[in-house]
């Protein structure tokens, strides 16, 4: 139903719109520079047969053009072949530190990365024992870069649960 309406709107007044487009002034050629005009007039006056040659179609060349068939395929570049032959270097992996979260099956961790459990563990250790768990020790223990460890300790903190004593004596105490 929608296509019928759209077609009707599209074809409405089609002949008048086409006539209007046809009768519009066509864009004219950009004017030539005055020095170029004089040179062109001079060349045409010296060689009048050139003007006819430019306008004439050469049947021999047109027949050659019709016979041309181009079928091209890009050659496989040597860089692509070499890239396909070389295998990626194997990454270095390490085993996770703690296995007390067995529901997360992590077999190996790339060097320079840590799991979420390890991140929370090292943040908590650093918070509880900052003298023992320094950035250098964390860097060596988890095989991380110094700037990453410093950023981790600076911008990430673990949650703290604080229980405030009730101000009101009539508050219900938890059992």
Swiss-Prot record:
UniProt topology in membrane: Lipid-anchor
Domain of life: Eukaryota
One of the record's GO molecular function terms: calmodulin binding
Keywords: Calmodulin-binding, Disease variant, Host-virus interaction, Lipoprotein, Membrane, Mitochondrion, Myristate, Phosphoprotein, Primary mitochondrial disease
Effect of residue 3 to P: In MC1DN15; results in altered complex I assembly
GO BP: defense response to virus; mitochondrial respiratory chain complex I assembly
Pfam families referenced in this protein's UniProt entry, alphabetically: UPF0240
Modification after translation (UniProt): Phosphorylated on serine. Prolactin stimulate serine phosphorylation.
GO cellular component, as recorded: cytosol; mitochondrial inner membrane; mitochondrial membrane; mitochondrion
Stated induction or repression of this protein's expression: Expression is low in quiescent cells and is induced in exponentially proliferating cultures. Expression is also induced when prolactin is added to stationary cells. Induced by dietary differentiating agents such as butyrate and retinoic acid.
Protein family per UniProt: Belongs to the NDUFAF4 family.
Protein's UniProt name: NADH dehydrogenase [ubiquinone] 1 alpha subcomplex assembly factor 4
Source species: Homo sapiens
């Amino acid at each position: 139903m929608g296509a019928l309406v759209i077609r009707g709107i599209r074809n409405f007044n089609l002949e008048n719109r086409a006539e209007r487009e046809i009768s519009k002034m066509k864009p004219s050629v950009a004017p030539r520079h005055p020095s170029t005009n004089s040179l062109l007039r001079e060349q045409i006056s010296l060689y009048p047969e050139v003007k006819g040659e430019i306008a004439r179609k050469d049947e021999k060349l047109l027949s050659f053009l019709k016979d041309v068939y181009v079928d091209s395929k890009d050659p496989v570049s040597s860089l692509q072949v070499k890239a396909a032959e070389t295998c990626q270097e194997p990454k270095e992996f390490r085993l996770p530190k703690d296995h007390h979260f067995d529901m997360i099956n992590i077999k190996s961790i790339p060097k320079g990365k840590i799991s979420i459990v390890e991140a929370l563990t090292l943040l908590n250790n650093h918070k509880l024992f900052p003298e023992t768990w320094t950035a250098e020790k964390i860097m060596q223990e988890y095989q991380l870069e110094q700037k990453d460890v410093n950023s981790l300790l600076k911008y990430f903190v673990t949650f703290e649960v604080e229980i405030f004593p009730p101000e009101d004596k009539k508050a219900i105490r938890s059992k």
